[in-house]
Amino acid sequence: MESPDKGYRRINDDLRHDYGIHVNDKRILRICRAKDVKSTIKYNNRGCTRQAKNPQYVADNRLNRQFYAQHPNEKWLTDVTEFKWYDGIEIHKIYLSAILDLCDRRIVSYVIGDRNDNALVFKTFDKAVKANPDAHPLFHSDRGFQYTNRVFHQKLEKAGMTQSMSRVGKCIDNGPMEGFWGILKRERYYGRRFASREELVHMIRSYISYYNNRRVQRHLGILTPMEKYQQCLLAA
C-alpha cells in the first residue's frame, strides 16, 4: 500500500477520486475487516514549542482558531519540526520549516536545514513571498524565537502581512499546522530508522510533493491541495 496509514475512510476517498467508485464508508470498513487491512498505529504529539525567553515582538492570537479561509493566500500557518537520522550509534537532526495555506491546505513553501535558526524560517518565508508576490495573508505561528524576532516582524510588515501568534502552551491554536506534522510523520517517518541525511531529506521532499499533488482530503471535497487551489483560482 502506498500509505500504510490509510484507514477505510481514506481508502474510500481514493476510490472516489481515482476510479469514480462511490460506495459508503461502512462497506469499505467491512471489506477491510474481512481482508485484515489495518492502518498503522497513531503516535501522540510530543508537545508544544515553548515561548522564546526574550521575545522582541509578540502578536495577539488574531487567527483565534478560525481555521477556515475562503480564498488561497488569505491565511498562512507556519512552524518548524525536527527529524532524526542515524550514523551507527550517532544521532543527527535536521529541521523542516513549512508554511501551510488554510484554504486549500497546500504547503506553500518549505526549507530543510541542519539548524533550527532564524535563517531557516526567513528562507521559508522568502520562498513563499517569491512564489506568491501578491499575497498578503494573516500569518500565524507559535511564539518560537524565530517568529518573535524583530527582523522577522519587519519582513512581514514589508510584505503587507498581519502577524498572529498562538497563546503560550496552546498547540491547538496552530492546529492544522501541527496536524500536517502528524500526518507526515505517521505516514513516512515513525517506525523507520533513516541511515543517512540524504535518505531522510528525499523522504521529506517526496512526501510533500505527494501530499500537495496526490493525497486527497475529504474536507477539501475529495480533492488534493493543489486541485483545490486550482479550483479556487478558476472560481475567482
Specify the residue positions occupied by each region the protein language model found.
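C-terminal domain-tail junction helix/linker
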Residues: E157-M161, I183-A236
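Active-site beta-loop-alpha junctions of metal-dependent nucleic acid enzymes
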Residues: H92, Y110-N132
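An active-site-proximal beta-strand-loop segment
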Residues: R65-V108
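Basic, flexible linker segments flanking DNA-binding modules
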Residues: M1-H71, K170, T224-L233
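Conserved, non-catalytic sequence blocks in retroelement Pol enzymes and Pol-derived host proteins
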Residues: P4-D5, G20, Y68, Y86, ...
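Mobile genetic element proteins and their domesticated derivatives, centered on retroelements
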Residues: I11, I28, C32, L63, ...
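Short small-residue beta-strand/loop micro-motif enriched in glycine and branched aliphatics
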Residues: D104-Y110, Q163-S166, Y190-G191
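RNase H-like two-metal-ion nuclease catalytic core shared by retroviral integrases
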Residues: A52-N54, S141-R143, N149-F152, Q163-K185, ...
